[in-house]
Design a protein with these regions (language model features):
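Anionic ligand-binding catalytic core segments
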Residues: 1-69, 73-185
Length: 185
């Protein structure tokens, strides 16, 4: 089993600012052109795009702003390439140093699709229309969003501290409203 980070695959230095759409396309291009896929390794591009965007929704919902290219990786075995399980996942928006997102959303024209805690997930889905039918991606995101509606209660039941649950930068109490504002509920 082999593991390689997004920064390593893209040959980027740590702390490099990345853009989701460009990064997704570059990763697909690199993997598609690699000798592994030409030798028959399986790589499900559609599943990869869906999982990438769902993970970013989870990062946002849980207040994990530390989404740089070392915190996402791919695994490879004898036949398949896929995203590794999520790791280094924590509510970094609660960090007093104010950890900013390293990978952000913008469309092909360079227009931001996230600003001040607002995410235009419908436009995000549209921005990936060359890779996946936007309605399919939006449906997947909506299914994930439905599971996040009662996140605060579930985190309380699991013993997450009130300091994190009530942290204003994460805003768990407002997550259902935010999901609705983002077009996911």
């Amino acid at each position: 089993l082999a593991m390689e980070s997004v920064y390593a695959i893209l040959k980027r230095k740590p702390a490099t600012r990345l853009y989701h759409g460009q990064t997704i396309r570059a990763l697909i291009n690199i993997i598609d052109r690699s000798n592994m896929t030409t030798e028959g390794f399986k790589f499900d591009k559609t599943a990869f795009v869906i999982e990438w965007v769902k993970r970013d929704l989870l990062n946002i919902a849980f207040g994990n702003s530390d989404n740089h290219g070392r915190n996402t990786a791919f695994l490879r075995d004898e036949t398949t390439i896929w995203l590794s399980p999520i790791y280094d996942f924590a509510p970094m928006k609660a960090d007093p140093e104010g950890i900013a997102r390293s990978i952000i959303w913008q469309n092909d024209n360079g227009q931001t699709l996230e600003l001040g805690g607002r995410y235009d997930f419908i436009a995000i889905c549209e921005s990936l229309s060359d890779l996946i039918e936007p309605s399919i991606l939006l449906k997947e995101l909506k299914q994930t969003a439905e599971k996040l509606v009662d996140l605060t209660n579930r985190l309380q039941q699991r013993g997450v501290s009130e300091k994190i649950l009530s942290h204003p930068a994460i805003a768990f109490d407002y997550l259902p409203k935010r999901l609705q504002d983002w077009g996911l509920l």
